[in-house]
Regions:
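Active-site HxH/HxHxD metal-binding segment of metal-dependent hydrolases
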Residues: 83-158
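Short, Lys/Arg-enriched N-terminal segments with co-localized hydrophobic residues
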Residues: 1-4
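Core dinuclear metal-dependent hydrolase active-site scaffold
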Residues: 36-38, 59-60, 152-175
Length: 175
């Protein structure tokens, strides 16, 4: 699976929370909070869910669309996040679901992207067991509906979505 993607998301979330980037703006929502950062050629939106898992969802806003990295899992966050996305006024081009395969059921199969190997991993004992634990703990508050399909991207390679380059690389063998 793609450990590098997971590390990037973790680092972005950590830096966003610490203010290292120097937030260009912040939007307080009812449940979560969004911090925005102007980067070279795109804008980064980090939605801090403030849910029981402390998750963050990242949106890369390119010139002609949005790419979402890891959807929120809780239904109330999904609803709030959808409203935020609508306010950006650009279409969602891709939803990259690396370690968060929940929350993507409302997107078309050609919008949902899983990195090579993630589909099998999500059905396995480790990830599948974690999701079963979430179901037991949070019940109907989380969205674990099956998605209709997805595009799979190789663990090595580049994709350009919304005018922004996304590089994928294979993670550690233990990942």
């Amino acid at each position: 699976i793609v450990n590098a993607m997971k590390k990037i998301l973790w680092i972005v979330s950590l830096l966003a929370g610490s203010g290292v980037f120097g937030a260009q703006g912040a939007a307080a929502l009812l449940k979560g909070e969004v911090k925005t950062y102007d980067m070279d050629g795109f804008r980064l939106h980090v939605y801090l869910t403030q849910d029981a898992l402390g998750d963050a969802t990242t949106v890369v806003e390119g010139r002609d669309g949005l790419v979402i990295l890891e959807m929120p899992l809780f239904k109330e966050n999904l609803k709030e996040f959808a409203g935020y996305l609508k306010g950006l006024g650009k279409p969602v081009v891709k939803v990259v679901a690396d370690y968060h395969v929940g929350g993507v059921a409302d997107y078309a199969p050609d919008q949902v992207v899983l990195v090579e190997g993630m589909s099998e991993f999500a059905k396995g004992a480790v990830y599948g067991g974690m999701l079963e634990g979430f179901k037991a703990a949070f019940g109907d508050a989380i969205d674990l509906r099956e998605h209709a399909g997805h595009e799979e991207v190789p663990a090595e390679g580049r994709r350009i979505w919304a005018g922004v380059a996304f590089d994928f690389s294979r993670g550690a063998s233990s990942d």
